[in-house]
Regions:
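Juxtamembrane intracellular "pre-TM" segments in multi-pass secondary transporters
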Residues: 1-17, 41, 230-247
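Pair of pore-lining "gating" transmembrane helices in MFS-fold secondary transporters
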Residues: 8-33
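Short amphipathic helix-loop junctions that connect adjacent transmembrane helices
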Residues: 32-51, 184
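Helix-to-loop junctions at the C-terminal end of transmembrane segments
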Residues: 63-84, 183, 187
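A membrane-interface helix-boundary motif in multi-pass transporters
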Residues: 81-82, 181-207
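C-terminal ends and interior cores of transmembrane alpha-helices
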Residues: 88-109
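Multi-pass alpha-helical transporter architecture, strongest
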Residues: 101-104, 197-239, 244-247
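Intracellular juxtamembrane helix-capping segments at the cytosolic ends
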Residues: 128-152
Length: 247
């Protein structure tokens, strides 16, 4: 308990916990309402909505692979730091949600190609920020710095990973519940279904933007602490450590 209290006093660790929770809340909230949105507003068939889900998930995978290339030892940070892409991924996800919001207000029946590019933007953003967050989590968990009156080694990496993993798990489950509840409430209160979904997507976009701001704050704190923190000393650098150098 004392170690957890000391960890929570660390501004960077606490802010990163908030970021993980907020970003994963927005990430999971969108998943269960995209298919009903396409069916209700665009009058898509079940087969078409399933195709849209495939487009979104494929785009997420592309974003993940792109981030893996950006953070690889071959690129070595020439395309920007991983923490920068963490912020950019959240902003891109917010833009994707806003685009879905606008598309619902100007929807035309059974226009499959109207949604696919928007889901591509959303999926790329999701893939970029999610893998960037994992990479940043690995880096921050191995930082060694004093917390309060404890020695630098008192707070173990496993405690940090456990805290952030718990935040991710709770947010992922809660996001699905809140996303569907918000859409049901909006549909009940508003006569126009497209407007109802637009409100929900706009709210999710705001959550992504909030996560982007938190990620930017984590990045700024991390940059300010360069040279004041350390990492476990190793005689050889593994490929994973070389990748983390790009963060």
């Amino acid at each position: 308990k004392s170690s957890l209290r000391e960890l929570w006093r660390d501004d960077q660790a606490r802010l990163f916990t908030y970021f993980i929770f907020t970003s994963m809340l927005a990430y999971s909230a969108q998943d269960l309402i995209l298919e009903p949105f396409a069916g209700v507003v665009y009058h898509f068939t079940p087969g078409q909505t399933t195709q849209l889900s495939g487009t979104l998930h494929a785009s997420v995978l592309v974003g993940m692979l792109l981030l893996a290339f950006i953070g690889s030892a071959w690129v070595k940070g020439r395309l920007g730091k991983i923490s920068t892409w963490m912020v950019s991924g959240c902003v891109l996800s917010a833009l994707g949600m806003l685009a879905l919001c606008w598309s619902g207000l100007s929807a035309s029946d059974n226009h499959l190609m109207a949604l696919s590019p928007l889901l591509l933007i959303l999926g790329l953003g999701n893939g970029l920020f999610s893998i960037a967050a994992i990479s940043t989590m690995m880096q921050l968990s191995t930082q060694i710095k004093p917390l309060g009156d404890q020695t630098p080694s008192a707070v173990k990496p496993g405690l940090k990973m456990g805290l952030w993993g718990a935040a991710q798990a709770v947010a992922f489950g809660l996001g699905g519940l809140l996303g569907t509840a918000a859409s049901d409430l909006a549909l009940r209160l508003m006569a126009n279904r497209a407007d109802a979904y637009a409100v929900v997507f706009a709210l999710e976009s705001l959550v992504f933007l909030s996560a982007a701001f938190m990620a930017w704050r984590v990045k700024k704190i991390n940059a300010a602490e360069v040279g004041q923190v350390g990492y476990p000393d190793t005689t050889e650098k593994s490929p994973q450590q070389l990748t983390l150098n790009a963060i």
